[in-house]
Amino acid sequence: MPSTTSQNIGTVISIRGSVVDIRFDNISSDNQLPPIRTLLRTGKDNSIAIEVFSQLDDQRVRGIALTPTQGLARGMQVEDTGEPLQTPVGKGILSRMFDVFGNTIDKKDAPIDVEWRSVHNEPPPLARRSTKTEVFETGIKVIDVLMPLERGGKAGLFGGAGVGKTVLLTEMIHNMVGQHAGVSIFCGIGERCREGEELYREMKEAGVLDSMVMMFGQMNEPPGARFRVGHAALTMAEYFRDDEHRDVLLLMDNIFRFIQAGMEVSGLMGQMPARLGYQPTMGTELSQLEERIANTGSGAITSIQAVYVPADDFTDPAAVHTFSHLSASIVLSRKRASEGLYPAIDPLQSSSKMATPSIIGKRHYDLAQEIRRTLAQYSELKDIIAMLGMEQLSPEDRKVVGRARRLERFLTQPFFTTEQFTGMSGKLVSLDDALDGCERILQDEFEDYPESALYMIGAIDEAHEKSKKAAEDKPKAEEDEDATSLHDA
């Protein structure tokens, strides 16, 4: 931790959960009342950290504890550090794992050759910003074809509990960190400790940890720590962008937990809640975080963020406010997850501002539009099929249904990060192979193939082998069935 120089000493006068009131009696021209966002230290060995949130009068401040307040009592002395919360930056932080205070949590010695910087920075001014129109390939078919990501943009993975947000984010890390030439930063906000440990182990085994930094503010930590960990990770990202002129891939899991932590802090501080109990300042707090994720002439920060959607309600204020900051929105569907169509991305609800002919090219754009049109027609026909059956459809509509069902299955993909659970080896598919497969399905080349031949494959040519194998296995299965029947007789 950076050394503290201030000798402004106060006294704890009130403790209510994570909210602590402190009085400073020796206020003078030399010792001023601690400004907003100043870090205070108290407790045994100064182990309890408090951030000033408001000044109540000319002698009292109110702060939120960033650490548990067990053992804190009225009358204890509080030291004003004279500095805001700071985090380490520098080449020494690569391959390491940190908490919100910049302490290492990977059981290794503290990094050397680092500089400490405030986690509270302003977004770059408009004059320094730059825009890019370059596509960032993920190796995941459905994303690259229908909702391409922007290099230097912000993409959100929206979904309720258990539809695969973290799995999809982990797969993106696996596919993109290896081919990403810059630095990758993973920021865990209010998520499970187990997931952080698993990710660290996987990245170490994959050999990509040397160009990666991890920062965690886990579920069990006080709301103040979860509220600031995103800002700390962004300070690290800004260092690599501005000082080392490198591109940064910033992965955040989960933005909803950041908003939730802000809601807890707001409630503790006694602010009047807005709709559904959210804090009245949610839009401002989210903008202060999101607007720092920006591109400048010296480098770009590409951000992928998981966003939990409470009760699958996409009109929830947390989801609505987050949508407005993103260049690509990837919506995960519980219905598709229940049908086993993984990744469970809803292609009709998901969108990307990159999906225009001038950026991705006319062929890609036309194919994406045709795929969406086919899937939308199938969605409309589902009610008729449920009531009257396929027989009542016109021949043309039956062809549309067949194409849509084959497209749905082709856009599934086995993941590297789930190999141990599914028993299927992961596939990384190039954009050209994905577009080629979709085009051939739309041209009815695979009309006579079983739908299962297109399910959980990589490139489209794998369907030939899968169909051939299924045809060989079928007579064998029938022979086994006949032998069993004969034995029973």
Swiss-Prot record:
Listed Pfam families: ATP-synt_ab, ATP-synt_ab_N, ATP-synt_VA_C
Stretches with biased composition (Basic and acidic residues): 465-477
Top-level taxon of origin: Bacteria
One MF term in the entry's GO annotations: ATP binding
Record region (Disordered): 465-489
Disulfide linkage: none
Catalytic function, reaction form: ATP + H2O + 4 H(+)(in) = ADP + phosphate + 5 H(+)(out)
Membrane topology: Peripheral membrane protein
InterPro entries: AAA+_ATPase (IPR003593), Alt_ATPase_F1_bsu (IPR017691), ATP-synt_VA_C (IPR055190), ATP_synth_F1_bsu (IPR005722), ATPase_a/bsu_AS (IPR020003), ATPase_alpha/beta_chains (IPR050053), ATPase_F1/V1/A1_a/bsu_N (IPR004100), ATPase_F1/V1/A1_a/bsu_N_sf (IPR036121)
Segments passing through the bilayer: none
Annotated localization: Cell inner membrane
GO cellular component, one term: proton-transporting ATP synthase complex
Coiled coil: none
SUPFAM superfamilies xrefs: C-terminal domain of alpha and beta subunits of F1 ATP synthase, N-terminal domain of alpha and beta subunits of F1 ATP synthase, P-loop containing nucleoside triphosphate hydrolases
Binding site for ATP: 159-166
Keywords from the UniProt entry: ATP synthesis, ATP-binding, Cell inner membrane, Cell membrane, CF(1), Hydrogen ion transport, Ion transport, Membrane, Nucleotide-binding, Translocase, Transport
CDD domains: ATP-synt_F1_beta_C, ATP-synt_F1_beta_N, F1-ATPase_beta_CD
EC number annotated for this UniProt entry: 7.1.2.2
Subunit structure: F-type ATPases have 2 components, CF(1) - the catalytic core - and CF(0) - the membrane proton channel. CF(1) has five subunits: alpha(3), beta(3), gamma(1), delta(1), epsilon(1). CF(0) has three main subunits: a(1), b(2) and c(9-12). The alpha and beta chains form an alternating ring which encloses part of the gamma chain. CF(1) is attached to CF(0) by a central stalk formed by the gamma and epsilon chains, while a peripheral stalk is formed by the delta and b chains.
Family classification: Belongs to the ATPase alpha/beta chains family.
Function as written in the Swiss-Prot or TrEMBL entry: Produces ATP from ADP in the presence of a proton gradient across the membrane. The catalytic sites are hosted primarily by the beta subunits.
HAMAP family: ATP_synth_beta_bact
NCBIfam families: alt_F1F0_F1_bet, atpD
UniProt name for this protein: ATP synthase subunit beta 1
Organism (species): Marinomonas sp. (strain MWYL1)
Gene label: atpD1
